[in-house]
């Protein structure tokens, strides 16, 4: 319970102080993932679900607060998009309105999305749905190198179930070097990471 309260306090402070800046929000989302990922893995999915419920409660305050900054060029739509990014970075969440994520260093260049953000649904169960074929060869050396770096990053955390390794890999891909990949590139690297981890 202390763990949940700790997250609650930190999330509240971050969202209330940094909502206006896209780069800061995404940066702190990545920081939160780093701070809590080990404890989330050790505590199991029950704790993860509890945190998700907590964050969804906070979500509505974040979206409402965006109206305060509308005069500064910060819209409710941008708040919704950033919330999508935050959940994706923290818990490997997918939404219907997921757009390609941009560099966290670009504060005011947001891609518009005409769809409403739907309820975030966990993709935990589908992580292994699509696996690379045994004959697959890297078509993009840069992406393959990124996959190798991602695997090295995962191994630095010590032993963890393969299930969680993939989650960590996918989240790390989102924020590596502050430049999230395009959706098709992200999927390509994800498959490479799965293949590399299976060889371990």
From Swiss-Prot:
Keywords (A to Z) from UniProt: Early protein, Host cytoplasm, Host nucleus, Host-virus interaction, Phosphoprotein, Virion
Principal location listed in the UniProt entry: host cell
Conditions for induction: Expressed in the early phase of the viral replicative cycle.
Cellular localisation: Host cytoplasm; Host nucleus; Virion
Reported modifications of this chain: Phosphorylated on serine residues in the 115 N-terminal amino acids.
Superkingdom of this protein's organism: Viruses
Disulfide bridge partners, by residue number: none
GO cellular component labels: host cell cytoplasm; host cell nucleus; virion component
Function recorded in the entry: Modifies the subcellular distribution of heterogeneous nuclear ribonucleoprotein K (HNRNPK) and may contribute to modulate HNRNPK functions related to processing and export of mRNAs during ASFV infection. Necessary for virus internalization.
Entry similarity comment: Belongs to the asfivirus phosphoprotein p30 family.
Description of how the protein assembles with itself and partners: Oligomer. Interacts with host HNRNPK.
Protein name: Phosphoprotein p30
Top-level taxonomy: Viruses, Varidnaviria, Bamfordvirae, Nucleocytoviricota, Pokkesviricetes
